[in-house]
Design a protein with these regions (language model features):
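Terminal disorder- and signal-encoded targeting elements
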Residues: 1-400
């Protein structure tokens, strides 16, 4: 377990400001002042895709038609750029919004896990909540027929394994309404998902190809790489970083938790991997939450692991203060939970979205950096901004 002493030789907020100055010329960080025009080279490989490594290909077959490839569907032909679209989860919806396609959204597969509050911080960026609320759980053939979309950003294998579809149902909608194109990427622990996975930015690149928005994708990829580079350069040495346990439990008075392994590499854990944390489950035989594994850990189990930081998903509509006043307060008064190091040090935080797209990931990475390394990046509720909201908004709205 890492020492939590403030008398550390690791980076301080002054150290971070030097990194801030290094990229202010590129508009990455707001609120910094510097004459420096130096921009660090990205070290994050997430967005460095190539033709050989990625199936995000667009092949012109006629002047206006093109094809896009993604497992498990394979190659899909488009006669024109889709105007009406729907996504199953918030990650793919966020990708389409990032590409300037918000007006074409007709609904979503799961509105309860599509968090749109982040758009409030981006001038000119929004989604129509009435549309989402009118079609919040689009999962049946009848709904797909009714909405008449031009593309369905759904993994059809997910429909088969979670919602009792069969192959004929998928083929029927793909033939009579519009194709499916999507891959369930938020975790990598489901036995039925025996085909290729994609990183967040590989999937984003594919969606960009669907909407023929290469320039917007590349602008986001550049911003992302610069942002992650700056954050990683500000991190403490590896042996001074906290051990982190990521869990799910939506109750305000939680008694048991579903565990996540960070080495699962699903996109829902991307910010924690980028922040270089030590997975508290490493070296244990505890398995990642999946379709078949619904096991939970009680407080006695958590005490055996005793992470420096405990992250709890399921509270993303609560503010940091509301989370502390409910979940953390309950743990502090609990006879067993109160013995946890994370509880005693007040290091129990919201764990981030289950489904995150490129816009959401920027906000979640910023929040995670402030949660885990407040001496460097400012506390969770500080006014520090680690990326430029206006730059993001300009990419989305096309004003870059």
């Amino acid at each position: 377990m890492d020492d939590d002493s403030t008398e550390s030789d690791g980076p301080t907020r002054r150290t971070y400001m030097r990194y801030c100055e290094a990229v202010v010329g590129g508009g990455l960080l707001a609120g910094c002042t510097s004459n420096s025009e130096t921009t660090p080279s990205p070290t994050e490989s997430e967005t460095n895709s190539s033709t050989d490594a990625s199936t995000n290909e667009a092949t012109e077959t006629e002047e206006s038609s093109y094809t896009v490839s993604m497992e498990p569907v394979g190659t899909v032909a488009f006669e024109s750029v889709p105007e009406r679209w729907i996504a199953y989860d918030g990650a793919y919806a966020d990708m389409a919004v990032a590409l300037g396609q918000a007006d074409g959204m007709t609904g979503i597969g799961g509105a309860d896990r599509y968090y749109t509050a982040v758009y409030d911080e981006l001038p000119g960026v929004s989604v129509d909540r009435e549309t989402i609320e009118a079609n919040p759980e689009v999962r049946t053939k009848e709904q797909f027929y009714e909405l008449e979309n031009d593309v369905h950003l759904y993994d059809p294998e997910m429909l088969i394994n979670w919602f009792d579809w069969d192959r004929d149902d998928v083929d029927e909608i793909a033939t009579n309404v519009a194709p499916f194109l999507g891959n369930l990427i938020f975790r990598r622990s489901d036995d039925w998902h025996d085909y290729r996975y994609y990183t967040l930015y590989e999937a984003f690149e594919t969606v960009a190809t669907v909407f023929q928005e290469r320039e917007r994708y590349e602008a986001f990829a550049q911003l992302h790489d610069e942002f992650v580079t700056v954050i990683q350069e500000g991190l403490p040495p590896a042996d001074e970083r906290p051990s982190v346990l990521l869990t799910f439990e939506g109750a305000d008075e939680p008694e048991a938790f579903s565990p996540y392994r960070l080495d699962d590499e699903g996109t829902s854990k991307k910010q924690w991997r980028d922040l270089g944390v030590d997975d508290a489950l490493a070296g244990t035989d505890i398995e990642n939450l999946s379709t078949t594994n619904r096991g939970k850990l009680d407080y006695e189990n958590l005490l055996e692991i005793d992470p420096d930081v405990l992250l709890v998903r399921g509270h993303e509509r609560a503010s940091a203060a509301e989370f502390r006043e409910t979940v953390l307060a309950f743990m502090e008064s609990h006879p067993v939970a109160s013995e946890l190091t994370a509880v005693q040090n007040g290091q129990v935080y919201r764990g981030g979205y289950l489904h995150q797209g490129p816009i959401q990931n920027l906000f979640l990475t910023e929040r995670g950096a402030k949660q885990l390394y407040p001496d460097v990046f400012g506390g969770e509720e500080s006014d520090e901004r680690l990326f430029d909201r206006q730059r993001v908004a300009d990419i989305v709205t096309g004003d870059r």
